[in-house]
């Protein structure tokens, strides 16, 4: 089955299927990057989408931000694989520019919650 648009989100509470127009498919991955990767690959194979929209709820560092934001770049905020790559970078990822969108905001993705100030995140202008 082919679809024009596939929306990937973690939880049904983030975006209800009923809110979508016909012809748009949505998959719920559950929480976590491993779940998201597995379910996303299965959905891509099942629906062969022309476009994929990753939709979700995130925290924020910048108190001025509200609403729906278009992310332009993502860094792995809790990835520290030095000396193989600098903090925030995934080692051996040779084409990170291919994963960017036209949005203006920087998302710091991670496998943990940010519970304290991190000067590194502020220095990288993570939103």
Language-model segments: residues:
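Short polar catalytic/cofactor-binding loops
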Residues: 9-14
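Extreme N-terminal starter segment of soluble prokaryotic enzymes
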Residues: 1-6, 24
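Glycine-rich phosphate- or other oxyanion-binding loops that anchor nucleotides, phosphorylated ligands
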Residues: 15-127
């Amino acid at each position: 089955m082919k679809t024009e648009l596939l929306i990937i989100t973690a939880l049904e509470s983030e975006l209800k299927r009923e809110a979508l127009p016909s012809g748009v498919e949505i998959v719920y991955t559950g929480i976590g990057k491993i779940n998201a990767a597995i379910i996303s690959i299965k959905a891509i194979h099942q629906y062969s989408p022309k476009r994929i929209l990753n939709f979700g709820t995130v925290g924020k560092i910048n108190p001025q931000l509200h609403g729906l934001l278009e992310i332009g770049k993502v860094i792995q905020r809790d990835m520290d694989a030095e000396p193989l790559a600098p903090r925030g970078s995934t080692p051996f990822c040779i084409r990170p520019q291919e994963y960017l969108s036209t949005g203006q905001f920087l998302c710091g993705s991670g496998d943990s919650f940010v519970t304290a100030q991190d000067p590194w995140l502020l220095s990288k202008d993570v939103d």
